[in-house]
């Protein structure tokens, strides 16, 4: 095996190899109807035989060259509650209804898929081998494990974790269960990718900027800082031939797919593969046979997957956000994000047919990988102990302790040490709020939710136009204080799903030494631009910011979702009315509709009565008077 110094010199030198009368009219019409009826009776058996023969012999055509992306719209009812997620050591997937004609086959019968799933406030690793078996837990604890990557031989699992404070790389031996630390630095390090021979790892490293680092796996040597560019370079993936590396970079001004060729030197080593300024690409991955690339792209409101071939360019495959290939390079498995849930689906790489119906995952995806070798059987003792562990939610969901059994309604619970116009929430969600508050405070280093713009809002307090049926009236929602935005401590990134706009909220970590949060990869929205005097920015409600904020940030939306709190879409008028953006509102429905939630607090009579709106005070006007002119008496 070549030494670290030999690998470094060979890479740097280009030698590395690894969609008339009434009566008459009545007679005529009646005769026509009789003729049509007789014709129908005679021809119907022939028609039925013909159509049955055609349908039996010809399959339903499937379009392979789509000119416009088709978005998979998941059912909003097919979800798992946080309580169900936390009560299972082996998490079972939830299938969405799909026509059998749409499914080609089940792709998850061979090999091993490892997912990083965010659950109950933390991200952990799970093995997913087929639809018949649930997820098998591989890691557990009060920390986060993300971006897993299986080695070519299937024995080793590299991933990033903050279990020791800063984000470092770790190596899990699936045969023995032994865990080894690969890096120990204050910098953020994640997204490892293996070289074909399994001796090297390429990964992203953040030190005020994202760079691609190549290091040896077994001799603890950092070989090369590949990119060394002022732009952000991240999410590397190694070519199966070993001579090329693909990564995401914003060198051209937006995230695009770039190629690093080890046979070239200087600026000739790097080239832009996607070349599409209208899209934001991410998560590239090589096919195991080395002939194609797949990546995700965001264009306007479409979340799409593309397969790129050097001789054919990029072609659209389907909807998705994070693709991986099966070991035979025939299936693309992908995570598909919706506003408040994540799904798992798959496509045939050759004709884009659906290979796996959408499966609702119990949490959001923070990484996934697919290898040819299954999990060892039996599992090593250390992994068997982890499989049996059950994470617990920091609160118990359900009815509150002070339910009004006399009328079937539940009271409001006070929020201790929280500033708000009405510091109360429904008795069934107040503990969930306090759990979210504590979790965010621990992750960010400051009590972000100690001050709220609104918690419960009584019916006597009218909200702005368009918010007559807002969740704030139910006591199951809150809006955080937007003042930290002015100090640059909170930023929002717009996310488009269908025709609706949602916001992802990031909070700046108090300690910027790498022990809290992660670096951002997206440019936030600048609401203040609407007041800069430019009519265009005013009409569109602001503009995209000038760049990615530096430092470490905590994804508030991610944490809230893992504890059951959902976000609301912006109102259609958000571009002209700041309050309509609703970026700061989160609610916990507990499987209830808005009307059902209102009946928990109010009798039906209260909801049938229109919400009182006080009439405006009449503007006082002076009573006109005519001047009295005295005339002399005769």
Model-identified regions with their sequence ranges:
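Mid-length scaffold segments of soluble, non-membrane domains
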Residues: 470-492
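Active-site acidic/histidine clusters and adjacent loop/turn architecture
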Residues: 370, 375-451
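Catalytic cores and adjacent binding grooves of peptidoglycan-active enzymes
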Residues: 46-48, 486-627, 634
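Acidic helix-start/capping segments at beta-turn-to-alpha-helix junctions
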Residues: 445-466, 573-580
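Second-shell loop/turn segments in exported
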Residues: 415-427, 465-467, 537-549
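Structural recognition of the beta-strand scaffold that forms the well-ordered cores
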Residues: 448-451, 477-482, 567-570, 585
